Amino acid sequence: MTAATHTKAQVLAAALPWLKQLHGKIVVVKYGGNAMTDDTLKAAFAADMVFLRNCGVHPVVVHGGGPQISAMLKRLGIPGDFRGGFRVTTPEVLDVARMVLFGQVGRELVGLINAHGPYAVGITGEDAHLFTAVRRDVMVDGVATDIGLVGDVEHVNTEAVRDLIAAGRIPVVSTIAPDANGVVHNINADTAAAALAAALSAEKLLMLTDIEGLYTDWPDRNSLVSQINTADLTELLPTLEAGMVPKIEACLRAVTEGVPSAHVIDGRVEHCVLVELFTDEGTGTKVVNP
């Protein structure tokens, strides 16, 4: 046996405690950032989801599509804007977001996963009443600001997702959803992932980002934290960069509503999901209750 083979065996053996802990459990993964634009990282992420499924873990993927939406808006000559970390969504922007999220980003990820077998099924928040949206404002410099057809999750109906899990499938969720009156809204994927994780009683929520984890004093690289509780994180929230706010709010929401832990992980690391779930080191910041 070669040294490399022995090392592989040790890695697999070391993963056993985590495999036992997660067997039969649901893990919600928010897929976004560089992991969804780099071909190598995209393929690695898809393989990670199939690995989890074949180890008896139930992955549920919720994906964003910000860069792809921005690219299509530019291509179509439609202006786009962000406020408070959220995209301002006019009816024209919503049409593009709806098309790109389900018709492009979701289709690509489903295809990558299904290259390994008949696993992934794409759905949106509109399907089987998965999400009911409620229009939301965001705080910009302390002022409540309207950002158009952007919703929060008012209600989650998990039946369709649970049916897919029971059938051995990997749900791939696009975050477009109607409100109670049928008006369709764009829901931030971080927000939707947290709501779905809580409703499914998931064991973990993983948030892929383009940084190593949570910095308490950005840009000081020494301020990276490996674990933080919800009380400390709530105090820290007003000081964070706008782009991190939806992700941290999502972690707080998930853990507060019963998910044992939420993890902000570095999606630029190949196989980051497996590293976070099945090794001592992990790749980012773990959020837990005090």
Swiss-Prot record:
GO terms for biological process: arginine biosynthetic process via ornithine; L-arginine biosynthetic process. Keywords: Amino-acid biosynthesis, Arginine biosynthesis, ATP-binding, Cytoplasm, Kinase, Nucleotide-binding, Transferase. It is an enzyme of class 2 (transferase). The record marks 30, 247 as: Transition state stabilizer. The keyword Nucleotide-binding applies. It is found in: Cytoplasm. Pfam families: AA_kinase. Coiled coil: none annotated. It comes from the Bacteria. It catalyses: N-acetyl-L-glutamate + ATP = N-acetyl-L-glutamyl 5-phosphate + ADP. GO terms for molecular function: acetylglutamate kinase activity; ATP binding. CDD domains: AAK_NAGK-C (cd04250). GO terms for cellular component: cytoplasm. Its EC number is 2.7.2.8. Pathway: Amino-acid biosynthesis; L-arginine biosynthesis; N(2)-acetyl-L-ornithine from L-glutamate: step 2/4. InterPro entries: AceGlu_kinase-like_sf, AcgluKinase_fam, ArgB, Asp/Glu/Uridylate_kinase, Glu/AcGlu_kinase, NAGK-C. Substrate binds at residues 65-66, 87, 186. NCBIfam families: argB (TIGR00761). Catalyzes the ATP-dependent phosphorylation of N-acetyl-L-glutamate. Belongs to the acetylglutamate kinase family. ArgB subfamily. This is Acetylglutamate kinase. It comes from Mycobacterium sp. (strain JLS).
